[in-house]
Regions:
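Active-site metal-binding motif and surrounding structural segment of the metallo-beta-lactamase
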Residues: 50-96, 114
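Divalent metal-coordination and catalytic microenvironments
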Residues: 35, 45, 74, 94, ...
Length: 138
């Protein structure tokens, strides 16, 4: 293709999206995933202690104080263990579905709660999050 010819490659005209995903923990003892587009950083679940999540973020050069939110997938203990502590310590809003919001007594006081409906897209700054339902056994 010559330089002055129009591009027929649709991907060439699409904006470049960079997404960093770091699995901090995955398993029955705790789940936590760091997601960032370079400007907005969130945690999906915080199932370890707040101190352990901070330690794992720090060990990967990720600053806990740069997080903008925690998104909780569901209310099982291995997904919510550090949510309350991190939300209070870093003044992070917590996004959870309505059913999970009913379990916040186990999480403790949260800085700010935002509920979402599965199937409805919501945004945390630049990140577009499309939650959906799955069956999950404990």
């Amino acid at each position: 293709m010559l330089a002055d010819e129009p591009s027929t490659n649709a991907a060439a005209s699409e904006p470049s999206v960079k997404l960093a995903v770091c699995v901090l923990a995955s398993g029955s003892k705790g789940n936590a995933i760091y997601v960032s587009d370079g400007q907005t950083a969130i945690l999906i679940d915080a199932g370890l202690s707040g101190v352990e999540i901070e330690r794992r973020l720090d060990s990967r050069g990720l600053a806990p104080d740069r997080l903008q939110a925690i998104v909780v997938s569901h209310e099982h203990a291995d997904h919510i263990g550090g949510v309350g502590v991190l939300s209070r310590r870093y003044r992070l809003p917590v996004y959870l579905n309505r059913k999970t919001a009913g379990a916040t007594k186990r999480i403790g006081r949260l800085h700010r709660v935002n509920t979402f409906d599965c199937g409805t897209v919501f945004h945390v700054d630049n990140l577009h999050i499309h939650p959906f339902s799955l069956s999950h056994d404990a």
